[in-house]
A protein has these predicted regions:
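Active-site neighborhood of phospho(di)ester-bond hydrolases with catalytic His/Asp-centered motifs
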Residues: 6-7, 43-48, 77-84, 104-109, ...
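Metal-dependent catalytic neighborhoods of phosphoester/phosphodiester hydrolases
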Residues: 14-16, 49-67, 82-101, 107, ...
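Conserved catalytic scaffold of divalent metal-dependent phosphoesterases
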Residues: 93-97, 101-199, 259
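Conserved beta-sheet core of the metallophosphoesterase superfamily
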Residues: 185-264
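N-terminal active-site segment of His-dependent metallophosphoesterases
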Residues: 1-68, 75, 373, 380, ...
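Active-site neighborhood of divalent metal-dependent phosphoester/pyrophosphate hydrolases
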Residues: 10, 40-58, 75-89, 178-202
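Binuclear metal-dependent phosphoesterase catalytic core
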Residues: 113-121, 125, 130, 233-297
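Accessory, non-catalytic peripheral segments of nucleic-acid enzymes
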Residues: 37, 42, 257-392
């Protein structure tokens, strides 16, 4: 069976006050074209369909358009679960009616975990849909007092699946969470923590060992495509970059082929966005030089770091005349190389000239050499001020 695994669409996302819906429509249209070319047996979307529980109207309309194209025009079934950004009840509304059209949505968590059976030439493939739910919800739904965190919650849900499954068949889990083995996972700033403990650096992870024996586990939540402790357990990642911590990530969808006896092959297929998200760095004059930006996409979403010394007048407006989609800007603060203490540097200040005092101050504050050119400018300014003072 050939499945296309994606996640974290975050339709309706706003990044630095910029609505991403147009970019999302572009990338989702390309996803539909890829589906048409690859013709997988099923599309799996592992949570965070929307960016917030109550999505804007344009986000709902975009999802309706995309799902209609996939289901009605291409005839490809869709399996979809709620993530931690979604409202389970809203996402799952009408799901039983939509099953006949090939759209399988798991919104609110149910004790009888939804099982979707799809068949290929080798027989059935069983998809177990586990939407995101907090440990408190899992504890209540499964009436299990042993559930105290995300790991014990997943352990209980997988235990219930194993009570009823046929281990000889090909079984797939679709879920949304923080699953890991021994290795570190690549994270990004746009991923909302699943709990307070994660937000303050806790270890509220789910052990990848819970998924032993499954042919494939399709994960959502982390935005970088990567495996999670096992080649059979993967994050597909988001389709777009949603923070500047993701600039080095290569966004893709995952094509997973599950053979007759559960043998697995993985291929990552890239989708090119309308606008990339990049960091650029340099002086204001340098970044405005046509030779610098001539061979780049000036429409990209940018974080700009300026390396100029001294005051700049309206740098953002000047930069946006060339780069219209700058989302953030900062000024590089060079590390100061202090070779002596301020106390020793200040010794003998009563016997120093104003120019020498300013030179010491400048070097101490910036860590830069006080050049002869700068000394001439400051000396002229001091002379002018002293002349004006005498005339008063």
């Amino acid at each position: 069976m050939k499945l296309m695994h994606t996640s974290d669409w975050h339709i309706g996302k706003i990044v630095n006050q910029r609505h991403m819906t147009f970019d999302q429509e572009y990338i989702l249209d390309n996803l539909v074209k890829m589906l048409e070319a690859e013709r997988p047996d099923v599309l799996v979307v592992a949570g965070d369909i929307y960016d917030r529980g109550i999505p804007p109207v344009e986000a709902v309309e975009l999802l309706d358009k995309v799902l209609s194209n996939i289901l009605l025009q291409l005839g490809i079934p869709i399996i979809m679960i709620a993530g931690n950004h979604d409202s389970p009840d809203r996402l799952g509304f009408g799901s039983r009616l939509l099953r006949d059209k090939g759209l399988y949505i798991s919104g609110p968590l149910l004790k009888d975990i939804q099982k979707v059976v799809l068949c290929d030439e080798y027989g059935p493939v069983n998809f177990y849909l586990i939407p995101y739910a907090s440990p408190a919800v899992v504890r209540e739904v499964f009436a299990c007092n042993e559930v105290c965190d995300h790991d014990t919650a997943m352990k209980e849900m997988i235990r219930c699946i194993r009570e009823k499954w046929n281990a000889e068949e090909r079984n797939v889990v679709v879920t949304h969470g923080f699953i890991r083995g021994m290795e570190e996972l690549e994270q990004s700033e746009s991923e909302k923590p699943l709990s307070i403990t994660l937000a303050v650096g806790g270890t509220d992870f789910v052990d990848v060992k819970h998924f032993d024996g499954f042919a494939y586990t399709a994960l959502g939540h982390l935005h970088g495509p990567q495996q999670a402790g096992s080649p059979r357990v993967r994050y597909a990642g988001s389709l777009l970059k949603y923070s500047f911590s993701e600039t080095k990530q290569e966004k893709s969808v995952t094509l997973a082929q599950i053979g007759k006896d559960g043998e697995l092959s993985i291929e990552c297929k890239s989708l090119l966005p309308l606008r990339n998200m990049r960091r650029i760095k340099g002086t204001l004059k340098g970044l405005l030089d046509p030779e610098v930006y001539a061979n780049t996409n000036i429409e990209d979403y940018l974080h700009v770091t300026l390396t100029d010394e001294g005051e700049l007048i309206e740098p953002m407006s000047k930069l946006r005349a060339v780069y219209p989609n700058i989302l953030s800007l900062d000024i590089e603060i060079k590390e100061r190389q202090v070779t002596e203490s301020k106390t020793s540097a200040g010794q003998g200040y009563k016997h120093k000239s104003k120019l020498d005092l300013f030179s010491d101050f400048y070097t101490d504050m910036t860590g830069q050499m006080f050049t002869e050119e700068k000394a001439l400018i400051v000396a002229k300014t001091i002379s002018t001020l002293e002349t004006d003072e005498r005339e008063l």
